[in-house]
């Protein structure tokens, strides 16, 4: 199983874009060349601010949604310190309950 990653890209106007991928470098290059998300086209210089492995696609999608709900200040703390990322991931991992 290919691991999925959560990443944040900083635009020239200091905004943070959140996404998921199986190959961070490839996806970053796509964004830089204008072939990635429309939200990043024409935003000037892009820098990869943060990336971390999150597990499978399902967990990556949930992590992406949760990070997109964070305030700018919380995202900046995540970028600077990785603050709270482990807790965020563990809160998303729900144990599978076997039903009888």
From Swiss-Prot:
InterPro entries in UniProt: GIY-YIG_endonuc, GIY-YIG_endonuc_sf, UPF0213_domain, UPF0213_GIY-YIG_endonuc
Span of domain GIY-YIG: 2-77
Listed SUPFAM superfamilies: GIY-YIG endonuclease
HAMAP family: UPF0213
Record-given protein name: UPF0213 protein YhbQ
Organism: Escherichia coli O17:K52:H18 (strain UMN026 / ExPEC)
Gene symbol of the encoding locus: yhbQ
SMART domains on file: GIYc
A Pfam family that the UniProt record links to this protein: GIY-YIG
Family designation: Belongs to the UPF0213 family.
Domain of life of the organism encoding this protein: Bacteria
